[in-house]
Amino acid sequence: MTVLLTGGTGRTAKHIAGIFRQTNVPFLVASRSSSAGTAENHRKFDWLDEETFPNALSVDQGMKPISVVWLCPPPLYDLATPVIKFIDFAVSQNVKKFVLLSASVIQKGGPAMGKIHGHLDSIKDVTYTVLRPTWFMENFSTKGEIQCEAIRRDSTVYSATENGKIPFISVVDIARVAACALTAETLKNSDHILQGPDLLTYDEVAQALTGVLGRKITHTKMTEGELAEKLMEEGVTPEEAYMHAAMDSMIKSGSEERVVSDEVKEWTGVKPRGFINFALSEKAAWRARK
């Protein structure tokens, strides 16, 4: 068995790769950037360049063929089209197992990853698992992310969620579940909502960060329109800004509180990381700018 990890420079794929190195699982990393893996296990790959598809599935002498693919869709407005094209190519090369990274609010047949989910379900003799995590904790700590920069620069977090609650999850836990799915003997054409243990409002996130950092962090509450404008000011495209703001309104209405999932522990045997634990480990990311 050899695993192909698309989205090789992404946060989740990097953690999956780390797990596979420790457990000696053969894998290749597919991305446009060679920094995603070593020269030996990196494959040049671009979702928008079908000529790179064969290269992504090519293995070195002595390696077993690619048998399962981690699908991490690209950050495109129409992300489903290129991913579906790659799935069809991979199936033509006898790949029969896929694990898709989707999102908690996106169901099969819905927009974006939902279209990919539906396509996987329609292919005969293909088995799959879809992971549907809620919002990433690392959105608060990754350099360049709007929330991270807002905490560092303005000591605030922005949202249009009002008092809606989110069970934020760490990419570390998503990767642990993904590694289990990618190495499972069989996949059951199923989807799994992944959540962290703490159901938090953004007010509570700000309060937790205040305690960890020793300086006041606030929650700047916005309307959906105000948040979209703020995101566009920060360089987000209009399509993505309005989509993100609309998702915040869904959170305000309780979209992330309706399902309680213990899937991380069920898959891995270990409880997911709590928000305070995450914040303590990422404290250096939020040093205030002078």
Swiss-Prot record:
For the keyword NADP, the answer is yes
* Annotated Pfam families: NmrA (PF05368)
MF-aspect GO terms? oxidoreductase activity, acting on the CH-NH group of donors, NAD or NADP as acceptor
Write out the catalysed reaction.
agroclavine + NADP(+) = didehydroagroclavine + NADPH + H(+)
EC number(s) given by UniProt = 1.5.1.46
Keyword Lyase set for record: no
Pathway the protein contributes to: Alkaloid biosynthesis; ergot alkaloid biosynthesis
Broad enzyme group: oxidoreductase
Q: Identify the keywords attached in UniProt to this record, alphabetized.
A: Alkaloid metabolism, NADP, Oxidoreductase
Q: What is an annotated GO biological process for this record, any one?
A: ergot alkaloid biosynthetic process
Q: What biological function has been recorded for the protein in this entry?
A: Agroclavine dehydrogenase; part of the gene cluster that mediates the biosynthesis of fungal ergot alkaloid. DmaW catalyzes the first step of ergot alkaloid biosynthesis by condensing dimethylallyl diphosphate (DMAP) and tryptophan to form 4-dimethylallyl-L-tryptophan. The second step is catalyzed by the methyltransferase easF that methylates 4-dimethylallyl-L-tryptophan in the presence of S-adenosyl-L-methionine, resulting in the formation of 4-dimethylallyl-L-abrine.
Family membership, please give it.
Answer: Belongs to the fgaFS/easG family.
Q: How does it assemble?
A: Monomer.
What is this protein's name?
Agroclavine dehydrogenase
Native source species: Claviceps purpurea
